[in-house]
């Protein structure tokens, strides 16, 4: 089915700092008016002066919460006749509730749909998707662990060390490394508790732990017409507590054949 392309006349950038400036510039180059938002703490920040229009958001909120004010951002977008919202990265960029609010108010969210976010935001589900298209995954399971006894049996089958992971985890949280069976029970209980507290769910699965791996990510870009391309890879291996510190591209340590396979696999999953 043909979907007529929609021309954007005005785009709101729901972010701050350098990424907001980059999006403002892209809008300018495309002849699109840009709308910026800023917290009261950012009143004199450089980025707010780079948008065609700029408005205070979340006046009664803190410097971070202001940029997480979904209702406030949507209300402003409607008042200013915004066609689309670009989330940048961080903040609301991976929040399916924000995407649904945009859809409900006939505002285009420049990014994945809420369904895709929910689908790929669940690590167990994303492993299933990768398996379905014959993309290799780390040895482990692709279903939630029911209890400690099941965790013990699976760990024995996979072999130690293993990693307990929250299916809804992110940002370096929700992971526990277990080197031997003697510490599995306490680590399993801790993983469930941390996952419940941080992500609202205690859904845990197990993977083989790989020491000092190369953490390679591939950026993909798709449109509503089914066209998908990759934008090559970046190396995110420099980490502290499972949180990325430095990313660089290209990943110069990759063999060319492996690079092609990884990028092709990313497109297959997308």
Where are these regions (language model features)?
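N-terminal beta-alpha lobe that positions the nucleotide/phosphoryl donor
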Residues: 1-270
